[in-house]
């Protein structure tokens, strides 16, 4: 059975989710997270994708992403980051096989009120998982940059419906 084609909406943001195969960890230590963030930066520049929010958990990742250059740029971004991380991770931990479960999921987010809730949902993921008590205490999300002004070379900024959020 063929895969369902991705929907591309020009000037829309997407909630992207990629999970480890069988919910296995895709990050085991801080250097794995840092490497993944470097890959995001590299492929963001290469493809022109914009990252408005992110959270890297041990076994999955979330992004709010915009792809001004179409579906191919978004796919190139996710493939480049995912494949590069998998090759490094598998080599580092002497493992073989797929690191990521299936292909990444993408959900179109058209309305600003939905995006505002999505920012909170993504950045509070480590709070819901009881890893930290506040999102700003988690080192692998965009909360500190977006809400507290900490420098983050990965993040782009978007203003939502005059809220100043984003």
Language-model features, listed with the residues they occupy:
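Short Pro-Cys-Gly-centered "Cys-loop" motif that presents a nucleophilic cysteine in a tight turn
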Residues: 1-57, 66-166
């Amino acid at each position: 059975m063929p895969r369902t084609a991705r929907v591309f909406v020009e000037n829309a943001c997407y909630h992207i989710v990629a999970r480890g195969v069988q919910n296995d960890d895709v990050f085991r230590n801080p250097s794995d997270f840092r490497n993944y963030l470097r890959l995001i930066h590299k492929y963001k520049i290469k493809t022109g994708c914009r990252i408005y929010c992110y959270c890297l958990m041990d076994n999955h990742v979330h992004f709010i992403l915009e792809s001004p250059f179409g579906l191919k740029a978004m796919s190139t971004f996710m493939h480049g980051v995912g494949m590069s991380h998998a090759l490094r991770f598998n080599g580092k931990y002497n493992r073989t096989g797929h690191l990521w479960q299936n292909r990444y999921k993408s959900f179109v987010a058209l309305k600003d009120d939905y995006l505002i809730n999505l920012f909170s949902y993504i950045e509070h993921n480590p709070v819901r998982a009881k890893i930290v008590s506040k999102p700003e205490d988690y080192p692998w999300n965009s909360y500190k940059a977006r809400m507290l002004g900490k420098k983050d070379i990965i993040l782009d900024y978007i203003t939502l419906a005059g809220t100043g959020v984003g």
